[in-house]
Structure formats: structure tokens, C-alpha cells
Amino acid sequence: MLLYIITFLVIFYAVTIKSRKSLHMLQQNLYNENNRYLKWLRHNLKSAFYHYDIIALILFIIAGLLHNFLSVILIFLALIILIFDTEVIKYSIMVEKHKKPLVKTARVRRQILTLYILNLLPLLIYTFNPDLKYILIVIAAIMLVLNYLVVYLVKVINTPVEKYVYHYYWNKATTKLASLTNLSVIGITGSYGKTSSKNILNEILSVNFISHPTPKNFNTDVGLMSTVNNDLTKFDEIFIAEMGAYRVGRIKNVCNLVHPKYG
């Protein structure tokens, strides 16, 4: 029994490491807006799915079919392969350089929670029905191999919650902006140079006004809502909002949020 629990825990550890990359790619691709994540996945099948964990999965399946003393040996071998593969993935994540690393926002933390619940289900079921050990180990291993698709499933499962959270913070931001009657909003958009233009304009305006630009390269509706709700104060006179146009209708949506007077 201890061997099977260890097997589930090793698989879960592998999931936690592999998910760092898959969640990062989901975030980088705007949580699959306009199917960006699925398109990325289609063009990166090798990096997403071709790992040694497939070999471990095959060994788990054979162990379940044999169901004899050789099964234990195969499970040990599969665990060694899994641990090796996981450490390789862990190292590759450490040395990879990205312009934008994974930001563990509240949304990402909710996704991690859902992901962990899904991947711990086989272990939970095993505690109630140990006779299903081989089937459940194979299911857990399949979920590991298909981690990038499981992360997409997590995104789908969390969609109702994310819609509720989005509208809550949208209403909070619009209410706050409406209360700041002395605030003028300047919108900045374009294909290139938005952040630089925003920073230059802020340097000029801050000489005579209390101006507040969106931080770094925050230019989505979510980023703007965060800035309004957390950073703007009643003393600010000018809000410089950087607005990104990632799809048709995006600028209109952001304008409906902040209602820029100039831009």
C-alpha cells in the first residue's frame, strides 16, 4: 500500500513542476483569448507532450495488466523515470528566460487550486477503494502526460468564477472612477511605444499635476481595474491609462471602463 501512495505523490509532484510551464503559457496567451493558448499548443506539441513521462505511463499500464511481482519492479522503474524527467523539466524552467515570468495572481492561484484538486482525485478515490490502484495510477499518469490539456480544462472549469470576479472588480473600478470627479483620464494606445510614451508623458505632466500612470506595461482591462482599485487616490489629478489592442473591440472595452478624456 505504501508503494502506491508514494507513486501517487511522485506523480503529483511531477504535476506541480510541469504545471509551472503550462500555467505560464496559459497566462502568456491571455488565458486562451481568441484560442491563443490552443494555437500555441498546436504549434508546440513536442515541448508540451513528448517527455519521458510517456514511458512511465506505459510502464504503469503494463504493471496493471501483469498484476504480479513484476508489477512492483515496473512501478519502481517508472518512478525513477518520472523523478528524472521532473528534475529535467524543473531545471529547464529555471534556466529559461522569459520577458514576462509567471505572475501568481489571484486568478492563477485559483487555477492552481482547481488543478491540484483534479490531480489529487485519483489518490482520494484510492483511499476509499484500494482495489482500483492500477487503474487510478494510470489515470493520474495520463493526467500528467496531458498536463497542458488538463490546464485548459481547469480554465474552462473556472470560467464561471472568473466571470463573477471580473464583473465584481469592473463595477468596483467604475464606481471609484465616477467618484473621482477631479480626475482627468488620458488614454494611450498604439502598436509600439505605448509604455515609453506613457512614461514620458507622466514625467512632463507630473511637474504641474499629480499624475498617476498604469504601472509597468499594464494595458489590459484587468490591469487597469487593478490599478484603479488599488492605486488611484482622491488626490490624483491625471490618470494615464495604457491600453493594449490585442483583438478587435479591446480598446472599446477599456474605454468603457476608464472613459478617457484625452488620447
Name these PLM-found stretches.
Residues L3-V103, R110-G263:
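Phosphate-binding loop of NTP-binding sites
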